[in-house]
């Protein structure tokens, strides 16, 4: 199976002013979703960079998803990518506690 995190980073890092602030993480899924061939990833970055990664009307985000899903077809996987700022990610982590 391909290293999807590496593919996502290769697509996203050139778009960022500060690539070291990028977080790409595979999200945990339940067993049924794994059997259904779905992979879920989170891309988190500073709020100032998020607009650049999503693009106007989501065109950049859609392009990133398309590129990653082309590789996913080789492995018979569907790849879902969610974009968030660090602020949104921190709020969700605090809500879980």
Per-segment meaning from a language model:
Residues 1-50, 60-63, 67-97:
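RNA-contacting regions in translation and RNA-metabolism proteins
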Residues 54:
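The feature captures the beta-strand-to-loop junction immediately N-terminal to the Walker
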